[in-house]
């Protein structure tokens, strides 16, 4: 089964971008509380 690179990368970006934003916001709030 051939994997569609465009579909795979698009899905990966859709998953990674919101996760990265949430991690950055979480780290910022945690560092501010300390």
From Swiss-Prot:
Its main location: plastid. It is found in: Plastid membrane. Pfam families: PsbM (PF05151). HAMAP family: PSII_PsbM (MF_00438). Belongs to the PsbM family. One of the components of the core complex of photosystem II (PSII). PSII is a light-driven water:plastoquinone oxidoreductase that uses light energy to abstract electrons from H(2)O, generating O(2) and a proton gradient subsequently used for ATP formation. It consists of a core antenna complex that captures photons, and an electron transfer chain that converts photonic excitation into a charge separation. This subunit is found at the monomer-monomer interface. This is Photosystem II reaction center protein M.
């Amino acid at each position: 089964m051939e994997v569609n690179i465009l579909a795979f990368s698009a899905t990966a970006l859709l998953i990674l971008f919101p996760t990265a934003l949430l991690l950055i916001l979480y780290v910022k709030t945690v560092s501010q509380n300390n």
